[in-house]
Amino acid sequence: MPTQLQRPLARLLALALLVLLARAAEDEPPFCAVRNRSTGSYIDLSPLASNVSGTPPNWLVRGWQYGANFTLGVCTSPLGDGPAAYYSDTGRRVSIGRVATTPRYTGKKLTLTYEGGDLCPNRVDRKSSLLYFVCDRDIHTIAQVSLLGVLHNCSYLFEVRSVHACAAARAAGDRSVLGIFAAILLVFAAVELARRCCAAPLRRRFRPDFPADRPRWAPAPTGWAARTRAFFARAAEPRQAIKLASSPPGHPASDMEAQNTLLDSLDVRSSGA
């Protein structure tokens, strides 16, 4: 049976386990958002992934010297179900990367990589795109996307300037594990202190202790070893024989006639009388 100290510790460990499980669920990467673990800042790019109507926006980017224009989405596909970025070549869409929803910090640069596009000209690698996000609070649109360069007609670099690329203090509802654990520990300590201070007086008031001289039932022996010890203890106890007043000296108490006489006359006395 757990002691009074073990029960509170078990409750505390159970609460700590629940906190860690909840924290593990919170640590799953959010959609199109990232936290800078070195500074604690939080960036949410999800507003760039959908319009007010909920449909994914199409970001049109001029290729200028490349000779083609590009269409891309941020964490979504501009086609709804297709590549995250593409360009048109003689009426055919050429994929330059599949959808990815997890931005990352590369040093101090916030980037989002689309990989797994169509085959590159070398027929070995596949086309990919790198979106480089820049915090800009002065632009009058939700974002401005421009093409920075193309490498071997296989890798494409875009710059995305937006106010949504600016870091916020912290995500809403974000709390540290130590803070949550400390709060639970304080509540647990307060409840345990109240229980220790109030439980004993209430128990004495509503369930008064029995007096010491009140007869109590002795606990029955359990287990074969305890029963064996109890049997030999009873066998070793001295017994007092019962004699009839009319029995001759030396007459055994187990005599049938003496027992019948005892029942008829009820004239008995103990051997110590």
From Swiss-Prot:
Residues spanning the signal sequence: 1-24
One Gene Ontology CC term in the entry: endosome membrane
Keywords in alphabetical order: Disulfide bond, Endosome, Glycoprotein, Golgi apparatus, Membrane, Protein transport, Signal, Transmembrane, Transmembrane helix, Transport
Domain MRH: 30-168
SUPFAM superfamilies: Mannose 6-phosphate receptor domain
Membrane topology: Single-pass type I membrane protein
GO biological process, one term: protein transport
Glycosylation: residue positions: N36, N51, N69, N153
Family matches, as InterPro entries: Man6P_isomerase_rcpt-bd_dom_sf, MRH_dom
Top-level taxonomic group: Eukaryota
All ranges on the Cytoplasmic side of the membrane: 195-273
Disulphide connectivity of cysteines: C32-C75, C120-C154, C135-C166
Side of membrane Lumenal, spans: 25-176
TM region(s), chain numbering: 177-194
Matching PANTHER family: MANNOSE 6-PHOSPHATE RECEPTOR-LIKE PROTEIN 1, MANNOSE-6-PHOSPHATE RECEPTOR FAMILY MEMBER
Protein's job: Sorting receptor involved in the transport of vacuolar enzymes from the Golgi complex to the vacuole.
Protein name: Mannose 6-phosphate receptor-like protein 1
Taxonomic source organism: Eremothecium gossypii (strain ATCC 10895 / CBS 109.51 / FGSC 9923 / NRRL Y-1056)
Lineage: Eukaryota, Fungi, Dikarya, Ascomycota, Saccharomycotina
